[in-house]
């Protein structure tokens, strides 16, 4: 039995998670009415889940003073889902501390100028703790406008299939059945 307590290499290894911003998620999505289909996760729910993964709060070894979070690859940010009129009424402000330099931009203008990835990055940044680890955690967020991204080989795989990809549930069932037969 290992007597090592604290920062073991295996415990702090980083995993790559994939999240699609337009695919309905069983826990992050909401149902508007019983007759309607499940909506994609809203911007806030998606950002809070991403912030949790970036901080490492989903791990049993989580500690606020250590950086044990994982990488997150978010695709299809161009189709971010927002509720209500936020897309046209939400305003982002910036100021460079000089008189008269306050600038404002709405969410739809920001999405046209920089894309949905920047909107998601700002939302996640607001949900991370404001400390020295914030920039390091945000650097592990990789957001893309479409499906294509260069991190396909790094994503978490279970039974040879990328977790969350079509058909990965069947791979999990096959592995579980094989384990039950073996036991």
From Swiss-Prot:
UniProt keyword Ribosomal protein present? yes
Q: Which SUPFAM superfamilies match?
A: Ribosomal protein L13
Gene Ontology terms for molecular function: mRNA binding; structural constituent of ribosome
Keyword rRNA processing annotated: no
Q: Which GO terms are recorded in the biological process aspect for this UniProt protein?
A: negative regulation of translation; translation
Where does it localize? Mitochondrion
Q: Coiled-coil regions in this chain?
A: none
List cellular component terms (GO): mitochondrial large ribosomal subunit; ribosome
According to the lineage, what is the superkingdom? Eukaryota
- Keywords (A to Z) from UniProt: Mitochondrion, Ribonucleoprotein, Ribosomal protein
Chief localisation class = mitochondrion
| Family, per entry | Belongs to the universal ribosomal protein uL13 family.
Query: Which HAMAP family has this protein been placed in?
Result: Ribosomal_uL13
Function (record text): Component of the mitochondrial ribosome (mitoribosome), a dedicated translation machinery responsible for the synthesis of mitochondrial genome-encoded proteins, including at least some of the essential transmembrane subunits of the mitochondrial respiratory chain. The mitoribosomes are attached to the mitochondrial inner membrane and translation products are cotranslationally integrated into the membrane.
For this entry, the protein name equals Large ribosomal subunit protein uL13m
UniProt source species: Neurospora crassa (strain ATCC 24698 / 74-OR23-1A / CBS 708.71 / DSM 1257 / FGSC 987)
Q: Lineage, please?
A: Eukaryota, Fungi, Dikarya, Ascomycota, Pezizomycotina
């Amino acid at each position: 039995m290992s007597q090592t307590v604290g920062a073991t290499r295996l415990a702090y290894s980083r995993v790559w998670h994939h999240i699609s911003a337009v695919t309905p998620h069983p826990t992050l999505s909401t149902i508007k009415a019983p007759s309607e289909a499940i909506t994609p996760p809203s911007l806030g729910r998606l950002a809070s889940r991403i912030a949790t993964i970036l901080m490492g709060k989903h791990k049993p070894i989580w500690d606020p003073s250590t950086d044990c979070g994982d990488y997150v690859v978010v695709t299809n940010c161009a189709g971010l889902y927002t509720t209500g009129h936020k897309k046209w009424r939400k305003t982002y402000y910036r100021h460079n501390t000089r008189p008269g330099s306050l600038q404002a931009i709405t969410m739809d203008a920001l999405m046209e100028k920089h894309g949905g990835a920047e909107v998601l990055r700002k939302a996640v940044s607001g949900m991370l703790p404001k400390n020295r680890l914030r920039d390091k955690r945000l650097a592990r967020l990789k957001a893309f406008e479409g499906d294509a991204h260069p991190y396909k080989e790094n994503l978490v795989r279970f039974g040879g299939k990328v977790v969350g990809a079509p058909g990965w549930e069947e791979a999990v069932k096959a592995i579980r059945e094989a384990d039950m037969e073996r036991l």
